[in-house]
Amino acid sequence: MAAAAGGGTREEMVYMAKLAEQAERYEEMVEFMEKVVTAAAAGGGGELTVEERNLLSVAYKNVIGARRASWRIVSSIEQKEEGRGAAGHAAAARSYRARVEAELSNICAGILRLLDERLVPAAAAVDAKVFYLKMKGDYHRYLAEFKTGAERKDAADATLAAYQAAQDIAMKELSPTHPIRLGLALNFSVFYYEILNSPDRACTLAKQAFDEAISELDTLGEESYKDSTLIMQLLRDNLTLWTSDMQDDGGDEMRDATKPEDEH
């Protein structure tokens, strides 16, 4: 058993991460999984198992998800206060939003550093490469959600580059029904709709992914059936939402791969 930095073996850190998940202590879950990544690198090769990478994804998604929800709420309150001319309250909300944004930036920086320095370079399996490149795109997209000006453009450019690199591999190497390929298409299409304001491109991408998966539904293995069909449902829901009203940005109704991936 390889010993993880900070005490405990890699296997023990995985167990502790699962405990933290059950206890909904996601910041600690992140810490345990970061130790697993360090232990994997120290053990040579640096690849995580499928279970480990899913635990890492769940940990970070919950930590970032709480702050993304907070940011949306505080931003909405700030706009309402500005709208009714309550300058003092609006300033307080703006200051509080900046605090949440600092936390969002730090969380994204942490996982992006892990991805760039450890996880993407060590990924040998095709599904792992696509998984980590998609994850890289996701966290740059989360930055693009609240950054402004040149920082927003940089985050959007980095998101596009990561998703495109993932898609180039996925289209060649993964079946249309593979849950990672479908999850990538889902999040890539949300990026086009929400960040790049390209509803036509978003709909085209989502529809193509859905149609290709439908045509090969009979090839779906039992182990990935639930994940794949759940993401297909989200793709279809988004298509319905986007095509029903292209003028509406979808707001809180927007769906990405958070739900299906959280169920791994």
Curated annotation (Swiss-Prot):
SUPFAM superfamilies cross-referenced by the UniProt entry: 14-3-3 protein
Region of interest: Disordered: 245-264
SMART domains tied to this protein: 14_3_3 (SM00101)
Pfam families tied to this protein: 14-3-3 (PF00244)
A cellular-component GO term for this protein: cytoplasm
One Gene Ontology biological process: protein localization
Skewed-composition ranges (Basic and acidic residues): 252-264
Domain of life: Eukaryota
Role of this protein: Is associated with a DNA binding complex that binds to the G box, a well-characterized cis-acting DNA regulatory element found in plant genes.
Protein name in the entry: 14-3-3-like protein GF14-A
Annotated source species: Oryza sativa subsp. japonica
Gene label: GF14A
